[in-house]
Every structure is written in structure tokens, then in C-alpha cells.
Amino acid sequence: MPVTVRVRRVGHRGPPLDLPRYESAGAAGLDLRADEPFTLAPGERRVVPTGLALELPPGHEGQVRPRSGLAARHGVGMVNAPGTIDADYRGEVGVILVNHGQAPVAFARGDRIAQLVIAPVVRAELELVDALSDSDRGAGGFGSTGQ
């Protein structure tokens, strides 16, 4: 069932960009666009403004995820993937990009730089205990289940 996300344009860096949209009928993410032109040098990271602030419905979050095409073609990804937008955050959405490639990558204002997935949030209640129940895996981590 669709939820309503309220969107406000912020920053005023030029003519209004299109609002994020799903690019196909089965797409999980709305494409976010850069609100200013920039060049990302090899090894450089940058917070890229989107020109948008969101009001997410209670009980939901926004997950900012990298675009696979940028990673495959240019080695550009996100430092914190996914980035989390909390329902009570009202500031401008920024995307932290990093260039893992060997060459600078230029972006124009309006280029798609990330995806925004809206997801429900389950809040946990923590219970402090003296011991945890046993499991087949136990404390094994970092490759302990095989290759």
C-alpha cells in the first residue's frame, strides 16, 4: 500500500528539478538527483545536496542507496550505504558519494546519483540477559558459514 511522503524544495540552486520518481513499474527506489554540478576526483568523497527535504510518515524511514550503474561504470558509490533518513528529520537530504575509480567523474545538475527506498521501521525493546540461547552458528562470524 502506498504511503505519502511530503517533499519540500530547499537550497534554490537553480530551476526546480523533477521530483524523485520510480523509473519502472517494479522499481523499489525513487531516483535522487544532484542539485548542483560537481566533479569527484579519485579517492574524493563529497556530500551532494539533492535540493529536497522530506517529511516521512511515522513508522517509516528513507534508505538512501547507491546506484549500481555508477558503481559499475565509474567506481562511484556511497560511503554509508544505506544512509538512513529518520522520520523526524526535516533538513536537506544529502548523498555521501565516493569515487573509488581511477579517473575524475563529472556530474551535471540533475544527474541521478542515488536511490531512495521508503521502508517501515520496527522498533525494538532491548532486554538485558545473562546468557543467549544456543544456535547452530554460535559466535562464528566473518565467513564462518563457508565460502
From Swiss-Prot:
The enzyme's E.C. designation: 3.6.1.23
Keyword tags: Hydrolase, Magnesium, Metal-binding, Nucleotide metabolism
GO biological process: dUMP biosynthetic process; dUTP catabolic process
GO molecular function, one term: dUTP diphosphatase activity
Cofactor(s) required, per the database record: Mg(2+)
UniProt enzyme class: hydrolase
UniProt-listed InterPro entries: dUTPase, dUTPase-like, dUTPase-like_sf, dUTPase_trimeric
Positions bound to substrate: R67, S68, G69, N80, T84, I85, D86
Catalysed reactions listed for this entry: dUTP + H2O = dUMP + diphosphate + H(+)
Pathway in which this enzyme or protein is active: Pyrimidine metabolism; dUMP biosynthesis; dUMP from dCTP (dUTP route): step 2/2
Superkingdom field: Bacteria
Family of this protein: Belongs to the dUTPase family.
Function: This enzyme is involved in nucleotide metabolism: it produces dUMP, the immediate precursor of thymidine nucleotides and it decreases the intracellular concentration of dUTP so that uracil cannot be incorporated into DNA.
NCBIfam families (UniProt xref): dut, PRK00601.1
Protein name: Deoxyuridine 5'-triphosphate nucleotidohydrolase
Biological classification of the source: Bacteria, Pseudomonadati, Myxococcota, Myxococcia, Myxococcales
